[in-house]
A protein has these predicted regions:
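Membrane-embedded alpha-helical segments of transport systems
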Residues: 95-100, 124-147, 296-308
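Predominantly cytoplasmic-facing regulatory/coupling regions of multi-pass membrane proteins
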Residues: 1-90, 148, 152-259, 285, ...
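Membrane-interface alpha-helices at helix entry/exit sites of multi-pass transporters
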Residues: 83-88, 103-106, 118-132, 286-296
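Re-entrant/interfacial helical elements at transmembrane boundaries that shape
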Residues: 106-114, 266-282
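Transmembrane alpha-helix interface/packing and boundary motifs in multi-pass membrane proteins
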Residues: 92-101, 253-273
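Hydrophobic, aromatic-rich membrane-embedded alpha-helical segments
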Residues: 87-114
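Juxtamembrane transmembrane-helix termini in multi-pass membrane transport proteins
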Residues: 74, 113-114, 123-124
């Protein structure tokens, strides 16, 4: 019975975001007439794809840097996995995120545990630290966008999100989390003890950043990762005549809005181009052009993950034949 429940849960985790993505693809294109769809296709085909490949290259560099940055938090706990394993695990993680959202973080820790014998809980803790740092940087970018484009962004978010529902959901989740912590603290069951042991290792991984020996290298990699993230998005705007003259803050606004789309579906399928088109419409870019550009950006990121993630998936067992 438990096996069936787990199978159903995993199936829903995989299928529901995919179905939502396919629905958003249909929704995005259903609003256009035949002539507008032909225009989207024309703009898509006329784009300068040299910028797409430049974007792919920048995405590759950002993920390599993420893998290399990971070594510093692990080293602070006296674990020294092979650098190529760290980089390849990052690419495999992004590949798996296309199937089940957020599964990539777990897979990274599992791969390093398998090939370099780094305890899962500790390596997973370092990944959580990375994500916390990423969230801080994203919040900084959001603050910059709100300073320059507050009315526009607020109007956009109000149009697509019901904040009262979001607040209720967050409150319910918060109460459930508090109840879980209370149970975890008071329970003497074996499963609670195992969870506490796991969380203890995760906690050590999270606080590994406090003991970094190469802090400036870590900071440099972090800045490089985010500069590449933005540039891999920005350069694609030069692939079309109608978008190449948008200002830096306008592109940053689209970058911020686009980051929301990744949450809803596998890799932003359907949602990402839709969000990009809607926000660019506020800057006077025709929705047909914005839709075409959104798909070019999404395809650049998708190609990068499929290409290098698939290659990494094949290389990891080959390069670690004696480490299984």
């Amino acid at each position: 019975m438990t096996t069936n429940k787990n199978y159903l849960k995993k199936t829903l985790q995989l299928v529901l975001p995919l179905l939502l993505g396919l629905f958003l693809c249909w929704y995005a294109f259903a609003q256009f007439s035949t002539e507008e769809l032909a225009l989207i296709k024309e703009q898509f085909l006329r784009a300068d794809y040299s910028y797409l490949w430049l974007s792919v290259g920048m995405g590759f560099l950002s993920h390599v840097s993420r893998g290399l940055r990971w070594q510093y938090t692990l080293a602070s706990m006296h674990y020294f996995p092979k650098r190529y394993n760290l980089v390849l695990a990052v690419f495999v993680g992004y590949l798996l995120n296309l199937t089940i959202p957020r599964s990539g973080e777990v897979s990274r820790a599992l791969l390093i545990n398998r090939y370099d014998k780094v305890p899962f809980d500790k390596s997973f803790g370092t990944i959580l630290t990375e994500r916390a740092i990423d969230m801080c940087i994203l919040l900084l970018l959001i603050a910059i966008v709100f300073v320059f484009q507050f009315d526009l962004v607020w109007h956009f978010l109000e149009s697509y999100f019901t904040f009262s529902y979001i607040i209720v959901i967050l409150l319910v989740l918060g109460l459930l989390f508090v109840a879980f912590l209370y149970w975890l603290y008071r329970s003497t069951t074996s499963i609670a003890q195992k969870i506490r042991q796991l969380l203890s290792g995760i906690k050590e991984g999270i606080f590994s950043i406090v003991h970094l020996k190469k802090k400036w290298q870590f900071v440099a990699h972090t800045l490089f990762i985010w500069i590449m993230y933005f540039l891999m998005f920005y350069v694609v705007f030069f692939s079309m005549e109608q978008t190449k003259d948008l200002s830096l803050i306008q592109v940053l606004t689209a970058f911020f809005i686009g980051s929301f789309a990744i949450v809803f579906t596998n890799g932003g399928l359907g949602a990402y181009p839709l969000f990009i088109a809607k926000v660019l419409l506020l800057f006077g870019v025709a929705e047909t052009i914005g839709t075409a550009l959104g798909w070019v950006i999404w395809i650049a990121q998708f190609l990068m993950i499929i290409l290098f993630g698939g290659l990494s998936f094949l290389l990891l067992p080959i390069l670690n034949k004696g480490n299984r």
